[in-house]
Amino acid sequence: MRSPMHSMLRAVDRSWLGAGLIGGLILFLVWQISAPAPPASRLFADFFDAYYAVGELLWRTGPAATWPLDEPCIAGFVNIPILGWLFAPLALLSKQAAAWTFLGLGVVAVSAAWALLRRLCRPEAECGALLLFLFLVNGPMIHSFREGNITHFVLLLLVLALLLWRAGSEYAAGLVLGLCAALKLPLLLYGVYFVLRRRWRIVAGGATMIGFIVALSLAVFGLALNIGWHDYCVAPFVGRIMPGFNVQSIDAFLFRLLDGQAHLHAWYLIEPTRAHKFMRTLVVAAIFAGAFLLMRRAKRLEPMPAVTGTLSTRDLLEFVLVVNLALVTSPVSWSHYYLLLLLPWGLYFGGCLSLPDDAATKWLMGGGIVLASLPVVMLPKDLGVLAPLMSRTLVSATFFGGMLTLVALARGAWYATQPSALAGRTSRPSWVAAAIRLARSGGRGGLSPSEVLTRNMVIFLVINACVVNAILWITAPFGFADTVLHHTRDFLLGRSNDDSWGPMMHALEYFENEYVRPPYTAPLYTELVFHRGEKFQYPPSSLFFFAGMRAADALMF
């Protein structure tokens, strides 16, 4: 079964002319609406505020701090100071001439990335036209061009690093990856990955490049200015939220899920609540734990055969899995970062990733491509009656596309580590095996009536708990959702607002004092209902759960 998106892309792949014309037309249209929006003076905003400003400062004045600013460090030295010298030659040109020159260099870099990525693909895949189309219509790519950012240059470096690794030049590949990490800090995750893989030549190359850049920056700019860059431009982003609509991270999504449209145009840092910290930690830990288990599982296998050069399916899958992880888990992941997903998409259509050739993979990859390729447009400040729904869903479409791609890659990594050598080495408990059997059964064949009933009940409960409640939460008026959150927070903190949650708070306090802390004195309902006259509408057993929540909250925070 083919997804409509997959079939359309394959149709485009058959015609270079169609890919170029249709992709070029979409590129032209998306360029007109993509952020930064008119007036035209804001075109190349990142380039003017950061790269050109730093290059001009270094060329005309010399090393000097560009902070403190009234806003977070999204201008001036956005990279470690020494990298500012890369842009100093552009200061010899006027601002407009420098910006269009930088755009031209970006087009050359993207063209080279496309050509090199095509070389990575298998010849029989014949995916050149399809890759051209994906590059032309990619919304984050066009957004990066209009902002004058450097993310599309990083795409070229990642493809180059993969080519060097394929050729067996691991130290050189590490050097390139080190430069990538210096330009985009979330890519430091590659260092952790290659340490876990014990690819010491790549680790040595990355450490050499990063060490050289840091040492050179210290030598040229001095210790104080480099520490200032870290304190103003790196440290504030760790553990805080940038809620603007073009930030597509787990943090931003969770914040918008609760906050709605109130901060869609806020490009300043917000201190997260304890509930947000807990949810973020839970989600990020689950993602990294899953990735770690996949890699550990792959490590137990015999070395996989190479599928391109010296690289195996595991090497390619995990390489693109790491970049995907870096995008979705970074504290601040701007929309244009997601153009880096062109790397896994290209390898997928190039036949290098060996993902399962089934409907689930096609739908996941197709959905990821559609969502993460949408144009990045400047949203109006008032979204009207659809604000509660759009701010919690469509605004995070790029992030959803990244998550769908991540699931497709993780699923492929799971199936790639299921050879016959591991088939008989299972030590699952019987209840786990039964649960897996129920989950994997596509229909009722082979299941007993009791198993069918159990499976249907589980499906019903999951749908009711996850889907129905999620829809109700998303479509609920913001005031109602916000009130529920405040009640929950006050409840966990031991505060009561004398509203409908007051009886619960009183019941919990009484329960903790009389039932948890000895000595036991009076029955619960006797005290609450008859002596205090309160109408507690929850069963007594629920208080054990609420008390456990309070205890966990106290231990955790």
Label each residue range with its predicted role.
Residues 320, 324, 335, 339, ...:
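Short amphipathic alpha-helical segments
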Residues 112, 116, 156-167, 194-198, ...:
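Transmembrane alpha-helices and membrane-interface helical segments
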Residues 86, 330-358, 545:
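Ampipathic, surface-exposed secondary-structure segments
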Residues 2-172, 197-335, 419-427, 431-557:
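Primarily membrane-embedded glycan-assembly and transfer machineries that use lipid-linked glycans
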Residues 175-194, 329-340:
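Transmembrane helices and adjacent periplasmic/lumenal helix-loop junctions
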Residues 347-435, 456:
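Aromatic-enriched
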Residues 150-159, 185-188, 205, 338-346, ...:
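Hydrophobic core segments of transmembrane alpha-helices in multi-pass, intramembrane catalytic enzymes
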